[in-house]
Amino acid sequence: MLRRLLKPNLVVTLRKLSSSSASYVDRHISVILCDQSLSLESLRKHNALIITGGLSENIFVASKLISSYASYGKPNLSSRVFHLVTRRDIFLWNSIIKAHFSNGDYARSLCFFFSMLLSGQSPDHFTAPMVVSACAELLWFHVGTFVHGLVLKHGGFDRNTAVGASFVYFYSKCGFLQDACLVFDEMPDRDVVAWTAIISGHVQNGESEGGLGYLCKMHSAGSDVDKPNPRTLECGFQACSNLGALKEGRCLHGFAVKNGLASSKFVQSSMFSFYSKSGNPSEAYLSFRELGDEDMFSWTSIIASLARSGDMEESFDMFWEMQNKGMHPDGVVISCLINELGKMMLVPQGKAFHGFVIRHCFSLDSTVCNSLLSMYCKFELLSVAEKLFCRISEEGNKEAWNTMLKGYGKMKCHVKCIELFRKIQNLGIEIDSASATSVISSCSHIGAVLLGKSLHCYVVKTSLDLTISVVNSLIDLYGKMGDLTVAWRMFCEADTNVITWNAMIASYVHCEQSEKAIALFDRMVSENFKPSSITLVTLLMACVNTGSLERGQMIHRYITETEHEMNLSLSAALIDMYAKCGHLEKSRELFDAGNQKDAVCWNVMISGYGMHGDVESAIALFDQMEESDVKPTGPTFLALLSACTHAGLVEQGKKLFLKMHQYDVKPNLKHYSCLVDLLSRSGNLEEAESTVMSMPFSPDGVIWGTLLSSCMTHGEFEMGIRMAERAVASDPQNDGYYIMLANMYSAAGKWEEAERAREMMRESGVGKRAGHSVV
């Protein structure tokens, strides 16, 4: 059947050729098999003719067939041809090894290599590079070292440049960079392949600086054999990108242009990638235009580069251009734009782009949904973020849970953050280090001591990456808990950064150990850490706590001498420090010297005047604040009400309290406490009572105590009894309220009622807490 399908005359010809000289046969078959227009089907027909013609044992013919089948991606057919040959030489073995190696079947190529060794055939300088490279691709280190030993044992070709380059590549690929360098240094001659292998090895193993060093050595060698090729330059640009070495990258760009390599697609692509990652959107844009046939990766890179530089308008222009050219965006480029919109807090644009995502059905892409969730968390649009989270969290999206956890932390929703973490634990979802930091910080803010300690155990138990952020949040947690021993131990064991120092200094200040905080600052400076504004603000708080004007002045001099940036927070802290340490003139001098003043600066200056009893100056400054179009805040009115209380300015205080509504400032418990104190001290007890009854929340002990004390002072015992009874009803477990009620009854001469109040206290199981002295 086969013979009927094939040309009979070709079979006859082959039979005649088989009796002719071997060299003539080889040449004739070679001409047939080297025909590039030969299809796979024709190749198989010729193979059949060769078998029927009795030439399957011909090594040269077999090697040609093996190579031809390999070029069609059919190494399995190459193996069939190989197995028909009984007497095999090194040329045939190399052919079958190459057939599988070139098609990515590295394990099979190594199997043939070991079969070759078992047959007694020794490898040559063509075999070794393929076998070693196969070991590199499979990361079979021990097999590769065995081959290295075999090469050294046989000798003769271990000093071959191709063999040496393959071993450099192998050791680099397996992560043994030092061994790769030893092999490279021992090579008597090095070609561009060897140089590229050692440069690439350094870059791939995170030693980009060393890679650039070898590139410079290669350039210094100066011979044509050592001249960098496009692949070498690609590695060089990658190294520059990893190091952020803009100057060196530009030099490499110039070298590529000078040596005619800039037109290479390898060079253009790597050059574009370098400029994109190095934060040079203009040069990245020019490189992008030189690419010509842009793919989705290059479009994504240029759009991301422009977006990261803050040029969102140009970034979106490129996004629309990409679509006009027939390129359909994928989830990666969509997510990239969403992430940058979130970072830049472009809320209207972010919402509009969300509409584009929905219209083009990208809302089903988990990567896009996670980016949208992150964006809305950054916008602090809690309701939208929660709605989106409810939709995507049902799909078991681990990243979404972590994003929402971090979002709650960012939006100061500490209770929700902790509740979500508990739910995550119940579902068995893993959290990342950033999420752990958010939960630990939430525990610090709401005083969840036990949960905070449990989180520390969780971090250790789950072998979570103990990043510096996690350590800093734990130091802050233990500092706020008052456990300075653990906080200090973690500080000493950590790879500290400025934030770590800040956390430890803040812990000392929080625990009222300001002297230790100041001493730690001195150590921080001596160890060449540059304090941040947060460090200095915290230290000024320590100076306030200790009343140390001298130390505060030293910190002020440090700020001036080091030319530290004087931002609004630091300026406000200095004004506050001088005011609270008794140097009101200096405080006002700094206030007047400030070019920009936010509400905090105005507040601390007003508070300073109130603290020193200069109510007129405080109110005058408030009037200036209104004229400067700075909106007063809650602390502004609290400082003013406190000043009016101490000065007894009832009408002025009432006007200020009513003025809060004008600025949409909702009074809190402290504002009401000041107003009640102001009214009570002036004898306006009925108005004070009316104020307490109209409060939108329950009074605390301070308000009840203020009101009852004034009732006692002004002899309003009936009102005092009425207020005390309400206080007891509001909090039956507060021993102070029972005592105040009993005292009020006693003052009114109602001894039986006083005794009954004490009896109620005993029946409720409330005992009077023992007094203590702070001396």
UniProtKB/Swiss-Prot annotation:
Molecular-function GO term, any one: RNA binding
Organism: Arabidopsis thaliana (Mouse-ear cress)
Transit peptide: 1-17
PPR repeat feature ranges: 58-88, 89-123, 124-158, 160-190, 191-225, 229-263, 264-294, 295-329, 330-364, 365-395, 397-431, 432-466, 467-493, 497-531, 532-566, 567-597, 598-632, 633-667, 668-698
Annotated family: Belongs to the PPR family. PCMP-E subfamily.
Region (Type E motif): 703-775
UniProt cross-references to InterPro entries, sorted A to Z: E_motif, Pentatricopeptide_rpt, PPR_At4g14850-like_plant, TPR-like_helical_dom_sf
Record's protein name: Pentatricopeptide repeat-containing protein At4g39952, mitochondrial
Gene3D superfamilies: Tetratricopeptide repeat domain
Pfam families per the UniProt record, alphabetical: E_motif, PPR, PPR_2
GO CC list: mitochondrion
UniProt gene name: PCMP-E98
Subcellular location: Mitochondrion
